[in-house]
Amino acid sequence: MSLTSEKPRGDSRPKVTIETIQGKKQRREPITCLTAYDYASARLVDEAGVDMVLVGDSLAMVMLGYENTLPVTMEEMLHHTRAARRGVKRALLIADMPYASFHISKKEALRNAARFIKEAGAEAVKVEGGEKRVQLVQRLLDAEIPVMGHIGLTPQSIHLMGGYKVQGKTLAAVEALMRDAVALDRAGVFSMVLEGIPREVAAMITAEVSAPTIGIGAGPDCDGQVLVLHDILNLTFVPPAKFVRRYADVAGAIAKAARDFKDDVEGGRYPSEEESYHLPRETQAALEHIAVRKREIGRAHV
């Protein structure tokens, strides 16, 4: 609970749109993207000037404690997207379509994607998969829903892939990735995530497609980069992937703050006089007067 009010937000920078992202590729300007799953983190990432905020299904692991992304539900994704929406004013807000939200039927896939736009305020959705997602992408575009593709290491397919493994190492695998990328590009995705693939393959795809490529573990030749916010903050409980760069130790800061708070309370150092509220003098005087009167009345009855 906080009794302080928020500072008003002022940002004169223009709103990031699909056109903004595509224009950056044309001008060869790097595109930035980070995940965020709640109001506070989304607001901070937005105010830092990041181009895109992704409410990723990775929240299953970093926010909800699941072992992988598969268990997270539509309702959980909608809940977190709504929270992020309240924090994002400038960046492009993208919501991840969770596992089984677009696999069962075309009708259900469209309904779920539309819920992200209509109910949660997302401006685009991300869908994992290559050639086999072309019809879905086109169907969503027909409903005016922008789509970000995602190929390479697709976490929703970990059981099929045999775990979190780098993809595209053989000639056949490279050719399959190229087909996936070209198919999604032709279908009309406004951008595509390339995850866990060799740098050389990512560079080939980036040169081949018109849609901006956003790398995560795909080397520096993509049009942009995305990372999980909790990874760069060291706010996870698993060893980082090779491609993760740690920019802060938030886990260490939280642990220290919690220990210091505990020690201060147990040692009688918190709260201090300066951290306590006080009665106005006139109210204090009135209470003291009442107390005196009660004592006088009590003595009179003895």
Put a short name on every predicted segment:
Residues 2-248, 252-299:
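Alpha/beta enzyme core
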